[in-house]
């Protein structure tokens, strides 16, 4: 009986150890499928260095990383859209897209639809260019006031803290 419980405890710890590596998501198997399909483990893939890893190292703060990650996710969504008619890898792409959707957009279908709209906007269309330039002031204003307001609040809090400690 003692051996049985010891064996079961060992088996459970082995299973938990494996579930730690496989429990990270169903997308690992699907990524391996895509790697095999595209022959992405071939040594010639390393020529010229990585596409995204080195860039991500330069972005340390979480809010800054989100900016660059949105561009990377956009790239993958475009890549998957370009390959949507390939039935051999369709299932793998669907599972990976779903996992990206959950991780990056917190499962919000509204955010996903907005994200898809943005990545599908053609930049070589004159009418689109004109609309984008027309909205540029609003976009720039949306980018700046929040950060200025945060800086102002931070400096006010610092000033109050110094005055209180004097």
UniProtKB/Swiss-Prot annotation:
Record Gene3D superfamilies: 1.20.1250.10
Signal peptide (UniProt feature, chain positions): 1-23
Source taxon at top rank: Eukaryota
Residue numbers carrying Pyrrolidone carboxylic acid: 24
Keywords: Antiviral defense, Cytokine, Glycoprotein, Growth regulation, Pyrrolidone carboxylic acid, Secreted, Signal
Entry-linked Pfam families: IFN-gamma (PF00714)
Residues the record marks as carrying a glycan: 39, 106
A molecular function (GO) term: type II interferon receptor binding
Cellular compartments per GO CC: extracellular space
One biological process term in Gene Ontology: adaptive immune response
Family label: Belongs to the type II (or gamma) interferon family.
Name the record gives this protein: Interferon gamma
Organism: Capra hircus
